[in-house]
Amino acid sequence: MPGNIYQCNEHIKRLCLQEHHTTFLFILPLAKTIKMSNEIVNLPTIAEIEAAAEVLSMPDNSTKVVWVKEKFAVKFSNGIPLSEAENMKFLAANSKVLVPKVYTAFIDLETNQTFIIMEYIRGDNLQKLLPSLMPTEKVIICKLVKDAIIKLQKISLPGYLGTLNHQPYHDSVFWTKDNNPLISGPFANQKEMNCRILERLHQTELSQYIQLLQKTVDSTLHNHHPVFTHGDLQLKNIMVEKAESRNDGSPAFKIILIDWEIAGWYPEYWEFCNATISCRFKPN
């Protein structure tokens, strides 16, 4: 259960609401500054965010990310779970995986839009950068991604399959119109998770297909270790910054993983399978 994770000045109004039984602190739009460690941060207003001309997200995305005041990347849309901000806060405190610094997150009560105000990452996403990379550079970046996944998988287990603070999954595999908690979790074990995935598929697929799939699931999807998982490792969610060259003259990079909306504890195969599907089986 997160507490008052944002330390604010006395003029900032605070409002605690409930989202899936977890208390989040909403910093309302009237907040002008926040204090993080010894840093006083002047936040952009909603008006400044909505007027931002530099759009960082893809044109067809329902969620918008903009560059504001040189310092901030702001993600906003209806339906973004505030837990995405909590995930990044959690990872910054509990792992060595590089993630954007989160300054604040809130819901605008007038529009019901979620806003996550983060640091702006200087660099390019891997989707944009990939065509210009040399084979040796691709190998270096692949190793960095692998190392990040290994670090994620070393995060302590909470004793369930689900997201931070014993909350349900946000992956579309578990989506139902009524947000059925029996389908979205959290789950006690992989067997329960498998049953609920098949139950979810029953809503859209033919029974013959489910029967065939049941046999495959029973014979393969068991005894996997639960590990912390990003869940959406598309190339566009891997930011790459060039660093100073190594002593041997070879190029050096660092990667920052973004878009932590569906992260949580999943069976160990989940990261690979989701990344493969997201990349549409492209060799690179």
How would you name each of these model-derived features?
Residues 2-55:
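Juxta-kinase regulatory segment immediately upstream of eukaryotic protein kinase catalytic domains
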Residues 106-109, 240-244:
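Short, low-complexity Ser/Thr-rich regulatory SLiMs
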Residues 120, 231-233, 260:
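Residues immediately flanking
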Residues 138, 145, 151-231, 241-253:
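An alpha-helical support segment within catalytic cores of ATP-dependent transferases
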Residues 227-228, 241-284:
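Active-site Asp-x-Gly
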Residues 236-237:
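Conserved protein-kinase catalytic-loop position immediately C-terminal to the HRD catalytic Asp
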